[in-house]
Amino acid sequence: MAKTTKGKTPRRARRNISAGRAYVHASYNNTIVTITDLDGNSVAWSSGGTIGYKGSKKGTPYAAQLAAADAVKKAQQAFGMNVVDVIVRGTGSGREQAIRAIQASGIEVKSIMDDSPVPHNGCRPKKKFRA
C-alpha cells in the first residue's frame, strides 16, 4: 500500500490588530486580564494563576501586575497591538496595579472605564459584605 504524504498546511498569516480592549476582572481571589480586538474576539489573556501563583497569592496586586504585563506582551508580540481601551470589572485588590502595569508596558491607553456590576438591590450579600 502506498503511503499518503500529508502536505504541510500553510500557517495562518499574522493578523495585524492595532487597537483593542483590555478587560480586567479583579475579584478578591484572582485577577484575570483579557485582551480583545474591537469586535470582542479574544486575542490574549493571563491571570494570577497562569503566572504561577496558587491559592491566596493569586489575588495580590503583584500577581495582577504580572498578569497584565504578560497579557499585553502576548498581544503585542502576536498581533502588534499598540492602543487599548481598559475596561475594569470588580473590586479586587489587583485592579489599580493591573491598570498601572498596562500603562507601563508601552501600550497606549486611550480610556479607562469602570464597568463593575452593581445590583439594584438584588440578592442579600454575604456577612462580610454587609455594612
From Swiss-Prot:
Record-linked SUPFAM superfamilies: Translational machinery components
Entry keywords, A to Z: Ribonucleoprotein, Ribosomal protein, RNA-binding, rRNA-binding
Gene3D superfamilies reported for this sequence: Ribosomal protein S11
Annotated protein name in UniProt: Small ribosomal subunit protein uS11
Entry similarity comment: Belongs to the universal ribosomal protein uS11 family.
NCBIfam families: PRK05309.1, uS11_bact
MF terms (GO), sorted A to Z: rRNA binding; structural constituent of ribosome
PROSITE patterns, sorted: RIBOSOMAL_S11
Any one GO biological process: translation
Domain of life assignment: Bacteria
Subunit (UniProt): Part of the 30S ribosomal subunit. Interacts with proteins S7 and S18. Binds to IF-3.
GO CC terms of this entry: ribonucleoprotein complex; ribosome
Record organism: Deinococcus geothermalis (strain DSM 11300 / CIP 105573 / AG-3a)
Function recorded in the entry: Located on the platform of the 30S subunit, it bridges several disparate RNA helices of the 16S rRNA. Forms part of the Shine-Dalgarno cleft in the 70S ribosome.
Record keyword Signal present: no
